[in-house]
């Protein structure tokens, strides 16, 4: 199974979701990590993960820019033949849900920290 983990910073993936990525990979899943460009992307790649820089601006409220991001993510899910997308943080969780629906046969999991 190919699983894509999507977060709003590479720092978040490295510090909070790295153990999940390792565990998924150890179970034989292909893992793709997606976040905006940052200093931890190289570290994730150095650990042997496929990391893709997303055109995401955490603070953007521009509807056109956000629509482009959802379209980009949907196309990425389709092109990569992703089976499951897991979105972390509110923006990534919502956008991953919409992109999974646009991509077709992609399962979706959303997680927003701090909700209990």
Spans of model-derived segments:
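A general structural signal for well-ordered alpha-helical segments in protein cores
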Residues: 17, 41, 70, 93-94, ...
């Amino acid at each position: 199974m190919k699983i894509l983990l999507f977060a709003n910073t590479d720092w978040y993936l490295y510090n909070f979701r790295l153990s999940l990525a390792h565990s998924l990979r150890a179970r034989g899943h292909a893992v793709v990590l997606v976040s905006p460009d940052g200093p931890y992307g190289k570290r994730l790649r150095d650990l042997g993960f496929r990391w893709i820089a997303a055109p995401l601006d955490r603070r953007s409220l521009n509807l056109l820019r956000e629509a482009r991001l959802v379209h980009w993510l949907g196309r990425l899910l389709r092109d990569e033949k992703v089976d499951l997308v897991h979105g972390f943080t509110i923006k990534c969780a919502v956008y991953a849900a919409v992109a999974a629906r646009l991509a077709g046969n992609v399962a979706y999991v959303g997680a927003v920290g701090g909700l209990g």
